[in-house]
Amino acid sequence: MAILDVLSFPDERLRTVAKPVEEVNDEIKQLVSDMFETMKDENGIGLAATQVNRHVQVVVMDVSEDQNEPRVFINPEITRKDGSTISEEGCLSVPGNYAKVERAEAITVKALDQNGEAFELDAEGLLAICIQHELDHLKGKLFIDYLSPLKRQRIRKKLEKEARLAAKA
């Protein structure tokens, strides 16, 4: 297992659209394992392969309080959206920034698990929000894309400044 580097906005690689996984093989299983380790190391609840510069449709998450309900979504697709909710979101690729985002309140998602078995899941609340957030990453979209251009620009400038300061240190 390995901890992978998480890309940070405004890195253009975060805008790459992920390709479907052709076969759930040992390489994909290793990626899933590494992504879980990376997510836990970063204290996250979800991670898309795009965020670790692997452009395949793989998402891992665990929204449980005890971090003991790991979920894997390979080639995920949302087949139903119901209702609307607004909640504050953050992202490992946009560190230290949070904003209110409107999402569907309840969803149904179909995907493959880490063994390549198909499943369908009805989700609501935090799980539904997290799934939608992570699936956006697979399309090259970030939660800040839902914000006004002015707010997005402020976040970009702040993160660019932090990166410059870190590079000097």
From Swiss-Prot:
Database matches in Gene3D superfamilies: Peptide deformylase (3.90.45.10)
Residues that hold Fe cation according to the record: C91, H133, H137
Active site per UniProt: E134
Protein's GO biological process: co-translational protein modification; translation
CDD domains according to UniProt: Pep_deformylase
Coiled-coil ranges from the UniProt annotation: none
Purpose of the protein: Removes the formyl group from the N-terminal Met of newly synthesized proteins. Requires at least a dipeptide for an efficient rate of reaction. N-terminal L-methionine is a prerequisite for activity but the enzyme has broad specificity at other positions.
Catalysed reactions, semicolon-separated: N-terminal N-formyl-L-methionyl-[peptide] + H2O = N-terminal L-methionyl-[peptide] + formate
Entry keyword set: Hydrolase, Iron, Metal-binding, Protein biosynthesis
The EC number(s) this enzyme carries: 3.5.1.88
Record-stated family: Belongs to the polypeptide deformylase family.
Cofactor, free-text remark: Binds 1 Fe(2+) ion.
Name of the top EC class for this enzyme: hydrolase
Organism: Alteromonas mediterranea (strain DSM 17117 / CIP 110805 / LMG 28347 / Deep ecotype)
One Pfam family cited in the UniProt record for this chain: Pep_deformylase
Name of this protein: Peptide deformylase
Disulphide bridges, residue numbers: none
Entry cofactors: Fe(2+)
